[in-house]
Curated annotation (Swiss-Prot):
Keywords: Exopolysaccharide synthesis, Glycosyltransferase, Transferase, Virulence. Involved in the biosynthesis of amylovoran which functions as a virulence factor. It comes from the Bacteria. This is Amylovoran biosynthesis glycosyltransferase AmsK. Belongs to the glycosyltransferase group 1 family. Glycosyltransferase 4 subfamily.
Length: 407
């Protein structure tokens, strides 16, 4: 089967779920290609990108996007003008039908820039807004094949995305062969938005448990080692985590908190660390490849990710980073946010605080640091949860069966 992954950018270091799906389907013998609208971060990339020679399998529809609205439009216009009379290019200017992706010249630029159609048995598209674009490209004969769209988080929660695609999504629901939300929460939301229930199948983003060695920690380090692995964005709740650490320090807690990742909030988080007098115990260490992240997980005592709904409505799906921590036997502390309670049951397979509640987080961390919780049954239950319900092998086998039936 010819399976083509379609994304807005590739590779993206934080989107390991896309990379892992790509390499899995290569491993089981599929003819795999990747189409990305723009090149991703080719500097901060994971080893699998090179190991599988994915650069040779990836087609970029447009060059690197320029910064700034005016520069973007000028770049796209320069691509469009030589092909302005091409029938598909003219049709792509139908703003009433194609919306913002037309008015911002994204769709016309793609149609103008690509001479031949891309054919596949199935286009597996990650994120709803990319699905909306791919669906239009099918209509304009740039893509030829069936389409399956995966909904993750921001694509179905962020207000400006929902507003921009309020006409696109109903058409996507009607014309796509299948919609794959990653949580039951998003399944219910898709149905509420008008998607036929029979077109929906929940597909989990999972991990490969055998690649994560379960380690039962006999004793906690002193100082306590707390770890987060996340993009530095609002919905990851890292500002709340830092505030919880400030409270924990005031209560006499002795700890080292390491945050792996990069993003737009780096300067803001550094300020929060300095303002909280936490520079001696909270460190931002930037991007780390997957192999090095495993070492950090192995050496930590607690994994912390108190996700929350951002001011613009942006929400998580179910963070893979939590699954990885659960697989290695790290006690996980998170929040009652989005699909996370589908992964973590409070006091059973981890600990959950209300969204944005730094006091509650600090109380959980203090309780764990003082040995007041029986951790071993919880981490064993967490490992069992990811092995059975968030196991990449099971999830991808089920996905392959779905795609085979569809093709």
């Amino acid at each position: 089967m010819k399976l083509t992954f379609f994304t807005m950018q590739f590779p993206v270091s934080s989107e390991t779920f896309v990379l892992n799906q790509v390499t899995h389907f290569i491993d089981i013998g599929y003819d795999v290609e990747i189409i990305a609208v723009f090149p991703g971060d080719l500097v901060n990339r994971h080893a699998a990108f090179d190991r599988y020679n994915l650069a040779a399998k990836t087609h970029y529809l447009l060059p690197d996007d320029k910064d700034g609205k005016t520069a973007k439009l000028a770049q796209r216009l320069a691509i469009i003008l030589p092909k302005i009379l091409k029938p598909g290019t003219l049709k792509s200017f139908h703003i009433g039908r194609y919306g913002a992706q037309s008015s911002k010249l994204l769709l016309p630029a793609i149609v103008a820039a690509n001479k031949k159609p891309f054919a596949a048995d199935i286009f597996l598209v990650h994120f709803g807004y990319a699905g909306a674009l791919a669906n239009k490209l099918r209509e304009l004969k740039v893509l030829q094949g069936k389409q399956v769209t995966v909904f993750h988080g921001a694509d179905i929660s962020r207000r400006h995305i929902l507003e921009e695609h309020k006409k696109d999504y109903p058409r996507l629901f009607a014309q796509n062969e299948l919609l794959l939300p990653i949580s039951r929460l998003w399944q219910h939301k898709l149905i509420a938005m008008g998607c036929p229930a029979e077109k929906i199948n929940v597909t989990r983003m999972g991990i490969e448990p055998e690649k994560f060695n379960l380690k039962l920690r006999d004793a906690l380090h002193q100082p306590l080692r707390i770890l987060s692995v996340a993009r530095l964005t609002e919905k990851k709740g890292l500002g709340v985590a830092i505030e919880a650490c400030r409270i924990l320090k005031q209560q006499g807690g002795c700890f080292e908190y390491t945050i792996i990742g990069y993003g737009d909030l780096e300067a803001q988080l550094k300020t929060a660390i300095a303002d909280g007098d936490l520079e001696d115990c909270v460190k931002l260490v930037g991007f780390k490849p997957q192999e090095e992240i495993k070492r950090y997980l192995d050496e930590a005592d607690i994994f912390l990710l108190p996700s929350l709904t951002a001011a613009d409505g942006d929400m998580e799906g179910i963070p893979v980073a939590l699954m990885e921590a659960m697989a290695v036997g790290l006690p996980v502390v998170s929040s009652e946010h989005s699909g996370i309670p589908e992964l973590i049951e409070h006091n059973v397979s981890g600990w959950l605080a209300p969204e944005g509640d730094a006091q509650a987080l600090a109380a959980i961390l203090l309780r764990l640091s003082q040995g007041e919780a029986d951790v071993v049954p919880v981490v064993l239950a967490a490992r069992a949860k990811v092995e059975t319900e968030f196991n990449q092998h099971i999830a991808y086998r089920q996905l392959a069966e779905i795609l085979e039936r569809l093709a």
